[in-house]
Amino acid sequence: MTILGMNRRNALIAKLNPREAIKGVNQKFETKERLAAAGVPVPPTLALIADEADAATFDYASLPQAFAIKPNRGRRGEGVILVDGRVEGGWRKLNGEVLTERMLRAHVTRILAGELSLEGGNSDAALIEPLIRTHPDFARMVPFGLPDIRIICLGDVPLMAMTRLPTEESGGRANLHQGAVGAAIDFRDGRIFRAVLGQEAVWDHPAPATALI
């Protein structure tokens, strides 16, 4: 079995892709615009809060019951908040915690300051989108949150694929660094043949205990 480590992967990305293309995909909003222009479905943008002036005038009460807020140039799922409904005093996060408007404003301030951005320290923007629901085919595998599928291609040729499955620990986020399960997919039949949680191999999703392999 050939293993592609993170360092080698990053080296190949830098070697095989134009610098401007890499810079573009590190920005969620710009990536969405490019995908939409190419006819790829993307979630609508509720708001892009670009600076403190935007934050001061933004009407947080206008937000829907369920939404996601994330740094435009975020990394490893840091700074992503998933909101699943309104409650007295604010909103309910996907993990059950209450999020007040004051807390949300403070979070946006941290995003704008670049505390949660890929570069770290450079100014960023806060992207707000509707909360996307799990596809029924994934529903049996995850208790909540939004799984996704990642495919690594060389040109137009797919080389490997994985699905990222949120857990209670990850707060519904499909980010491995936040505690999601990473599961390798066999191209021949679409089945999962290996899964990891953190540094450990697993055979089941932790909650509920659903067999993956």
State each model region's role:
Residues 5-20, 200-212:
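A short, surface-exposed helix-loop junction/capping segment
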